[in-house]
């Protein structure tokens, strides 16, 4: 418990006090956000706002995790390291995307093909490694079974280990891409994606702590309600650091934002959420916990699909938050109300998680 608190506190302090230093660094070098011409006109005033703030979020997370392990005199575990690898790897892809936008002063960053290849390499590496490193109980960080609140029994390795590995890599990469894009689409208003991330990752602190206390590896009497998650305490430490890092960053990212997280932060946080859902065996529960992200993605999919079929639009602009902007809602009002919706999704997800344990 102490290590989790230390991790969150260090992540918060590093982000809170490190972000203004990073802002000065970016302003000095004139690394500012380029605003799309086809976006809401109110956003033109944000042109030049420093971006790539995800660098601070990632750094604060790594430092929080490291200091917590040192203070608790514990060794990092493979699950936590895999989660950090996925977060940092996707953050690097996002950083390259942001840097190209800034250096070339355009809204298009990294070439789509190279972006997909980069995400694919990181995703495949994570997926393959997640099925390695069995512990004394022969549990690997991830499972080839599709999961809801725990493994469901739907095993992707139904036709053998080789087929299972291939299908798992495809499934995991789908989740990684989906969640990364979801957070990226949500990052359209000051503080929106950051605030929602605080709620969502806080839920996963609760989930991982509960899994740690009810782990099949620590309970004297193993029953059907215990969890077979590998290294849940280590995942809780990483997740607490992410919560602290996002909370500290939100101080500077809230309206009017002094800095944006950019693709650096959005891809990193999306990757971390995907990784957590895989490593905690909560792949479909994450859809509920991260429900606001899902709603944002669906609004974009509906808009594009409906327009292609009818040449008409469902929303004034997609994603959904831009629709409300063009409807005359104040940006802060939209953000706060979306935070409330995100909190309701999180409460529902955590409630379902706990109810399953009680019933099970």
UniProtKB/Swiss-Prot annotation:
Major site of localization recorded for this protein: membrane
InterPro entries found in the cross-reference section: Glycosyl_transferase_4, PNAcMuramoyl-5peptid_Trfase, PNAcMuramoyl-5peptid_Trfase_CS
Catalytic activity: UDP-N-acetyl-alpha-D-muramoyl-L-alanyl-gamma-D-glutamyl-meso-2,6-diaminopimeloyl-D-alanyl-D-alanine + di-trans,octa-cis-undecaprenyl phosphate = di-trans,octa-cis-undecaprenyl diphospho-N-acetyl-alpha-D-muramoyl-L-alanyl-D-glutamyl-meso-2,6-diaminopimeloyl-D-alanyl-D-alanine + UMP
Enzyme class: transferase
Topology in membrane: Multi-pass membrane protein
One GO biological process term: peptidoglycan biosynthetic process
Pfam annotation, one family: Glycos_transf_4
Domain of life, per lineage: Bacteria
Signal peptide: none
Pathway assignment: Cell wall biogenesis; peptidoglycan biosynthesis
Keywords: Cell cycle, Cell division, Cell membrane, Cell shape, Cell wall biogenesis/degradation, Magnesium, Membrane, Metal-binding, Peptidoglycan synthesis, Transferase, Transmembrane, Transmembrane helix
Location(s) in or outside the cell: Cell membrane
GO molecular function list: metal ion binding; phospho-N-acetylmuramoyl-pentapeptide-transferase activity; UDP-N-acetylmuramoyl-L-alanyl-D-glutamyl-meso-2,6-diaminopimelyl-D-alanyl-D-alanine:undecaprenyl-phosphate transferase activity
Cofactor(s) the protein needs: Mg(2+)
Residue stretches spanning the membrane: 2-22, 52-72, 80-100, 114-134, 156-176, 189-209, 235-255, 259-279, 284-304, 338-358
PANTHER family the UniProt entry points to: PHOSPHO-N-ACETYLMURAMOYL-PENTAPEPTIDE-TRANSFERASE, PHOSPHO-N-ACETYLMURAMOYL-PENTAPEPTIDE-TRANSFERASE HOMOLOG
Function: Catalyzes the initial step of the lipid cycle reactions in the biosynthesis of the cell wall peptidoglycan: transfers peptidoglycan precursor phospho-MurNAc-pentapeptide from UDP-MurNAc-pentapeptide onto the lipid carrier undecaprenyl phosphate, yielding undecaprenyl-pyrophosphoryl-MurNAc-pentapeptide, known as lipid I.
Stated family: Belongs to the glycosyltransferase 4 family. MraY subfamily.
Protein name: Phospho-N-acetylmuramoyl-pentapeptide-transferase
Species name: Beutenbergia cavernae (strain ATCC BAA-8 / DSM 12333 / CCUG 43141 / JCM 11478 / NBRC 16432 / NCIMB 13614 / HKI 0122)
